[in-house]
Swiss-Prot record:
Stated family: Belongs to the cationic peptide 01 (latrotoxin) family. 03 (alpha-latrotoxin) subfamily.
Subunit structure: Homotetramer in membranes.
Protein name as it appears in the record: Alpha-latrotoxin-Lm1a
Ranges: ANK repeats: 95-109, 110-120, 122-132, 133-138, 142-161, 163-170, 171-182, 184, 185-191, 193-202
Organ and tissue specificity: Expressed in venom gland, cephalothorax, and abdomen tissues from both males and females.
Length: 202
């Protein structure tokens, strides 16, 4: 999911597409979910990562730090992409060194899936998902099949619901038990089934 963006003057660490834990360095849960990836911030943008706007708020961002404010991110993406967030508090940790420190870069590596678009509903917001096409609408709701959730997983999306929180990233990265039943979060499917389908789609 992604376009060509002006390269920053730094080494680009390309992170191959694949399962989330192939490119997530570590995960923390401060006030939200903070992901540390194996690439600097500008490399993340250049290589096809969605940079959460909220991560760039209140962090003392400036040009010489290599970080962008909300308008900067919007300008870089040229309004070609839709970025959805579950809340403004997600990814709100201090990220002063995100652009220069590979261990603190934050963003979502998204697969090259030009045929997929997410049609967000107010009660089913999808966090930090960058889309490059409107050819197909995938509407997440209670009756959705594992196939639909597989699309979100394939995009590295963090799924939040009104009545509960199902953090796909956390289960993929931290938990060995991928058969966790999502029904208690209002999702009529299991993560394992969705993962199987996501794998088959590749």
């Amino acid at each position: 999911i992604v376009g060509t963006i002006a390269a920053a003057a730094m080494t680009v660490t390309h992170v191959a597409s694949g399962r989330l834990n192939d490119y997530i360095l570590k995960l923390e849960e401060p006030n939200g979910i903070l992901l540390h990836f194996k690439a600097p911030l500008f490399s993340i943008i250049q290589e096809g990562y969605a940079v959460p706007k909220s991560s760039l708020v209140g962090t003392g961002t400036s040009n010489n730090e290599g970080l962008l404010d909300r308008n900067g991110v919007d300008e870089m993406l040229n309004e070609k992409y839709a970025v959805q967030y579950a809340s403004e508090t997600l990814f709100s940790k201090d990220l002063y060194n995100a652009a220069s420190n590979p261990d603190s870069a934050v963003g979502f590596k998204l697969m090259e899936s030009p045929e997929i678009n997410i049609n967000e509903r107010n009660d089913w917001p999808v966090a930090s998902t960058l889309l490059r096409s409107s050819n197909v609408n995938v509407n997440l709701k209670n009756s959705d099949t594992p196939l639909n959730l597989a699309y979100f997983i394939d995009q590295g999306a963090d799924i939040n619901t009104r009545n509960g929180h199902l953090n796909i990233v956390k289960y993929l990265v931290e938990e060995e038990d991928l058969s966790v039943d999502g029904s208690k979060y209002g999702i009529d499917m299991t993560i394992r089934t969705a993962l199987d389908i996501a794998t088959d789609l590749k």
